[in-house]
């Protein structure tokens, strides 16, 4: 009996774990199909949906059924048409609601960016809103697919053709040309598409530069002194270190005024180019044009480990240099903007969630770019189209059923295609640095030795002394601050 109890308990645990690993999957109404192959029978690569799945999208299913229609679900359940208020109950039917065994992911593809050449803000916007293939046609077709009437001009029978593009303040308005004759109900009331609230965000990873003009390092000063060993034993286990801070000056120019409207999302470090290392940071949420130059202070050091024979000295030479670098640069700025559709909806079918039939005038704004809110986010609404509670704006399932999944995916991908503007200019920097500390040939100490003692540094109890002429004011004028020399025991 004990063995049987353990086996039964194991089965219960296994069943529980199996149930826990299979979470409910969303049912996208646009992928449902009604098959008339008999009770619980679906076409190839389809399966009957069960009661719980049908319950999650009941309103969508009922909207696709006849008034008194009864269709089957899995496991001897049926769903009734709108005449029965969409009741789900046990029963049998000759038709069956089915769902793909491998549902399409149906994600909106991400297309390569639409790149706009450099220019000021008006130039960049003009190029975008006047581009028929990459902008006018895609946004016009989206308005048409959603049910807006008359998205086109009098001189063409096609959506998105013969469109006027008008600048209104900081906005641009697209509307079908009404300068000709038209036939159809309220055909003189063209739907409009307003483009507004342009913003530009720098993409740090898009940095590129042209030919680099880099000067050869120029010697600006030489410091010569001595390392003296006054002891009776050779000295070789000590490091002589030069520490200093140097100020590098940099500047950038921006070719066009668009840079004033470009902002940085995160703290941005200017990429290092060439041998002149200038570490530049631009704070987050700043205008790209707000910081066009400055000075960067950097702490640097150079070390050498001299070998100084007993009662000898070696010459020490430190060379100080400066170098310049300049080059043209380019970044990309990601553009974002609002699209506002305005016009009356077609009575013969529209994708507004209530599907009104009285041709109401409707204005709706989509945000193209970063997420703002659910009402303006195409991707959010598309991804949540299986949730009845989130279908407060557009019925994307209806749009898919009317126009096809591939058509809607392509349309939305073109509307959401990233748009990037070029930011160009010139960069220049000048920096100072010390070369290697050079050690010369040892010279025995003698009575005729004369050592300039502008600055003397002793190694603690080492018998090693540095006599280096360091003029703080002179070095500061050359861009070298806080210059110190030290003698410390070698670490390795």
UniProtKB/Swiss-Prot annotation:
Q: Name one Pfam family in it.
A: APT
Q: Name one GO biological process term.
A: killing of cells of another organism
Q: What is its main location?
A: secreted
The propeptide sits at 446-492
* Post-translational modification, as annotated: Proteolytic cleavage and subsequent release of the propeptide trigger a major conformation change, leading to the formation of a heptameric pre-pore that then inserts into the host membrane.
Q: Give the region (Part of the transmembrane beta-barrel after proteolytic activation of the toxin and insertion into the host membrane) as residue ranges.
A: 256-288
CDD domains reported for this sequence: PFM_aerolysin
Name the coiled-coil region(s).
none
Annotated site residues (Important for oligomerization) in this chain: 155
| Signal peptide, first to last residue | 1-21
Q: Which UniProt keywords apply?
A: Cytolysis, Disulfide bond, Hemolysis, Host cell membrane, Host membrane, Membrane, Secreted, Signal, Toxin, Transmembrane, Transmembrane beta strand, Virulence
Q: Provide the site residues for: Important for heptamerization.
A: 374, 390
- Region Interaction with host N-linked glycan, as annotated, extends over 68-84
The record's Gene Ontology cellular component field reads:
extracellular region; host cell plasma membrane; membrane
What pairs make up the disulfide bonds?
Answer: 42-98, 182-187
Q: PROSITE patterns, per this entry?
A: AEROLYSIN
Q: Where is this region: Interaction with glycans from host GPI-anchor?
A: 346-355
Q: Which Gene3D superfamilies match?
A: Aerolysin/Pertussis toxin (APT), N-terminal domain, Proaerolysin, chain A, domain 2, Proaerolysin, chain A, domain 3
- Function comment: Secreted, cytolytic toxin that forms pores in host membranes after proteolytic removal of a C-terminal propeptide, leading to destruction of the membrane permeability barrier and cell death. The pores are formed by transmembrane beta-strands and are approximately 3 nm in diameter.
Q: What is known of its domains?
A: The C-terminal propeptide is required for normal protein folding and secretion; it maintains the aerolysin precursor in its soluble form and prevents premature heptamerization and pore formation.
Task: State the oligomer form and interacting partners.
Answer: Homodimer in solution; homoheptamer in the host membrane. After binding to GPI-anchored proteins in target membranes and proteolytic removal of the C-terminal propeptide, the protein assembles into a heptameric pre-pore complex. A further conformation change leads to insertion into the host membrane.
Q: What is this protein called?
A: Aerolysin
From what organism does this protein derive? Aeromonas enteropelogenes
């Amino acid at each position: 009996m004990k063995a049987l109890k353990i086996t039964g308990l194991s089965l219960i645990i296994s069943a529980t774990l199996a149930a826990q690993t299979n979470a409910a999957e969303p049912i996208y109404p646009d992928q449902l199909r009604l098959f008339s192959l008999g009770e619980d029978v679906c076409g190839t690569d389809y399966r009957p949906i069960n009661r719980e799945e049908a319950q999650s999208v009941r309103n969508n299913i009922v909207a696709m059924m006849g008034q008194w229609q009864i269709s089957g679900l899995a496991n001897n359940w049926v769903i009734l048409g709108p005449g029965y208020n969409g009741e789900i109950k046990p029963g049998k039917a000759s038709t069956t609601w089915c769902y793909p065994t491998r549902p399409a992911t149906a994600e909106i593809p991400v297309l390569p960016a639409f790149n706009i050449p450099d220019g000021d803000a008006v130039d960049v916007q003009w190029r975008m809103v006047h581009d028929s293939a990459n902008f006018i046609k895609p946004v016009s077709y989206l308005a048409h697919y959603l049910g807006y009437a008359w998205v086109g001009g009098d001189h063409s029978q096609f959506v998105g053709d013969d469109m006027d593009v008008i600048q209104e303040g900081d906005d641009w308005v697209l509307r079908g040309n009404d300068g000709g004759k038209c036939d159809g109900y309220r055909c003189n009331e063209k739907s409009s598409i307003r483009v507004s609230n342009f913003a530009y965000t720098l993409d740090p990873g898009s940095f590129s530069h042209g030919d680099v003009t880099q000067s050869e390092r120029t010697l600006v000063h030489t410091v010569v002194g001595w390392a003296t060993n006054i002891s009776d034993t050779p000295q070789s286990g000590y490091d002589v270190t030069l520490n200093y801070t140097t100020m590098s000056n940099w500047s950038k120019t921006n070719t066009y005024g668009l840079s004033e409207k470009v902002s940085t999302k995160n703290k941005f470090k200017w990429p290092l180019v060439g041998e002149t290392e200038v570490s530049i940071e631009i704070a987050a949420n700043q205008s790209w044009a707000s910081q066009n130059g400055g000075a960067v202070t950097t702490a640097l050091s150079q070390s050498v480990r001299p070998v100084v024979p007993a009662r000898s000295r070696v010459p020490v030479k430190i060379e100080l240099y400066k170098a310049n670098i300049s080059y043209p640069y380019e970044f990309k700025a990601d553009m974002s903007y609002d699209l506002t559709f305005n016009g009356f909806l077609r009575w013969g079918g529209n994708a507004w969630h209530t599907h009104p039939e009285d041709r109401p005038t409707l204005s709706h704004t989509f945000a193209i770019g970063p997420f703002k809110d659910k009402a303006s986010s195409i991707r959010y609404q598309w991804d949540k189209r299986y949730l009845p509670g989130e279908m407060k704006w557009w019925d994307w399932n209806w749009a898919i059923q009317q126009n096809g999944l591939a058509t809607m995916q392509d349309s939305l991908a073109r509307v959401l295609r990233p748009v990037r503007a070029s930011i160009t200019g010139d960069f220049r920097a000048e920096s100072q640095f010390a070369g290697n500390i050079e050690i010369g040939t040892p010279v025995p100490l003698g009575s005729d030795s004369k050592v300039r003692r502008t600055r003397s540094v002793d190694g603690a109890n080492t018998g090693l002394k540095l006599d280096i002429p360091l003029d703080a004011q002179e070095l500061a004028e050359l861009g070298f601050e806080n210059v110190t020399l030290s003698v410390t025991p070698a670490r390795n």
